[in-house]
Amino acid sequence: MENNNNNNKNDNEINFKKIEINETLESGKFIESKIDMKLGELIIKVQSPMCFSFHKHLVNQFCFNCFSNSHEINNAKFNKFKVDINKNYIIRCNNCKLIYFCSDECFEKVMSIESFQDSTSTNIHTPLECLILSNYHDQTISPKINTLHDQTENRMIINYLSKIAYSTNNNNKFKLLLIEMNQLIGDFNNDNNNQTLSLNEIKNIKNKSFNLRKLFNNFFFNIDKVIIEELYAKSQRNSFGLWKNSDECFGLSMYGNQTIYNNNNDKDDNISISYFNHSCFPNCVRVQENQSISIYSLIPIKKGDELSISYIDIRMSKNDRLLHLKEIYYFECKCKRCTLPPLSNLSLEIEKTIENYTCKNQSIKCTGILYLPPFNKIQRICNFCHWKEPINN
């Protein structure tokens, strides 16, 4: 056991000792580089989300275990749970009929008793989640505001609550999940946070939390409405879209912390990937690889620099960027690109750099970002469509 732990620490040291959390009154918490970084350096990788949900009209297209597009890799032939949908054999949970898999192996990893008892895997379709989804209706939780985002967010919260309900049954993996979520920032009842949200948004969260609590109470899991309100606030601050490509978002997710080790392989800090702040001129890029999320450096980064990613399409105009960030993420962007005079030399240089690392794949007019992965120093790769461009371009 000691050898395994040491191996894990060494892996984490390689990937994570290069960053740390800093905090200021103006910016709040952010991630800062502890070392000089090269172009294309892997900064952090989180293997799987704490909770997630797919858009309801796409649940039969993506594997609940590996997030693969199940319509592309249907290869299950002898599973009693497979069903014929549009002449494609797909494995699913036959109780709620809302959880699908690409293979027998993925089915077993999520649905088997052995997986539930496994000490590490938290990607489990619990009996409680199955019951809730079988009796769940979007209009019940969000009767007035019922957008696709709301529906997916509700199901993501259900996914999380359905797992921590088992944290009292001597199940350490779900207790750790609870601890990780508690470390994320929501602050729904914080006065400053509620000044950011409109009265309608606050009312919507309160109504959804009340209705969701009532639904769980029907199955004897009693949870305080305030806890659910905080989960919705955390979702607004910490959730990531699940993207098939630059135009197709298929779900929503929240990722927990990664442990950082110092040079002596001692625990140094816990860092959440959600602490990467937004910039319209980012120095890092987010890459989704099935369940995992990786952050790579887009440009050389100096020690002490804040690390940032873009939450939006960086090709948008300044006015569109500001409006989108205000409406969706509830903040006014004050990054260098948004505050510089538009015709200044530095502003023009930034726009030239942005143009250089945006995807050039004209066949689908992709809005992704080209990055240089550590395993390939010859070609840059788009973080969305995976289009490749020779580095000498």
Curated annotation (Swiss-Prot):
Alphabetic keyword roster = Methyltransferase, S-adenosyl-L-methionine, Transferase
A Gene Ontology annotation in the biological process aspect, one of them, is: methylation
Instruction: List GO molecular-function terms, semicolon-separated.
Output: methyltransferase activity
Q: Name one GO cellular component term.
A: nucleus
Matching entries from InterPro entries are given as: H3K4_H4K5_MeTrfase, SET_dom, SET_dom_sf
> Per its UniProt entry, which superkingdom is the organism in?
Eukaryota
Name it: SET domain-containing protein DDB_G0283443
